[in-house]
Amino acid sequence: MTLKVIDVSAHNGTILWKNVKGRVDAAILRAGYRGYGSAGTLAEDKRFRANAANANALNIPIGAYWLSQALNEREAEEEVAYLVKLLKPFRIAYPVYLDSEYCEQNANGRGDRISKVQRTKNALTFLKAVAAAGYTAGLYCAENWFTAEIDGEAIRKAGYTIWCARLAGKPRIGDHDAWQYTWKARVSGIPGDVDMSEFYRDFARGGADAATKPTTGARKSLDTIAAEVLAGKWGNGADRKKQLAAAGYDYAAVQKKVNALIRR
């Protein structure tokens, strides 16, 4: 299964979403960012609310990403608290990603020169908080960043979905659920170039492809279901609750187990 997914921000200008509909399978929207200056001010993407509202109105599945410049775990938690408030009014079917990359051309952003160990701690804190808020959490980064600047393998082993950018060909990082392969796609309704990715899991339909989608045949343990929830295989929010109930699982018990796993 391969899905066409764009990612957009205020830099893409005013988007005519009615023209976009039917040309892509989903969109990942920049919700906001922490400024890369010393103040580190939290900010909302100027087009996020309009993009999210218009995509929701047309039933175009959306996810979100947040560009982090957190210096420590406390700031990572602060970023998620701000982010979740932005997301709450909207239907978020696709993952909520931590965008980990240099934020200033010469790597002089406030968070650009923290250690790999600290950046990984920040990322794990961020993603745990996103998952605790009921969203599928994931990491976005470039292929070289996955090993050089962050411990991508530790994040993958923790059960978070991976979205990797590589313009020269498919990422060589092992398992990943999405590949951003160009920054210069063209889609009707979007002025100029737009980022395009291939996604290999349909998060809008429970977060798994046909080979891995949860089934209702065999009864699974609470630990197994909770792990699948963290891996994004049961969707988000109300959709997750509906799917778990339809499969005969106690949503409250599963969510309690998920929260316990996150706190480990």
Residue ranges and their predicted role:
Residues 1-133:
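Substrate-binding cleft of extracellular glycoside hydrolase catalytic domains
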Residues 1-18, 153-218:
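Functionally critical loop-and-helix segments that line ligand-binding/catalytic clefts
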Residues 130, 134-148:
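Aromatic-lined carbohydrate-recognition surfaces of secreted/lumenal glycan-active proteins
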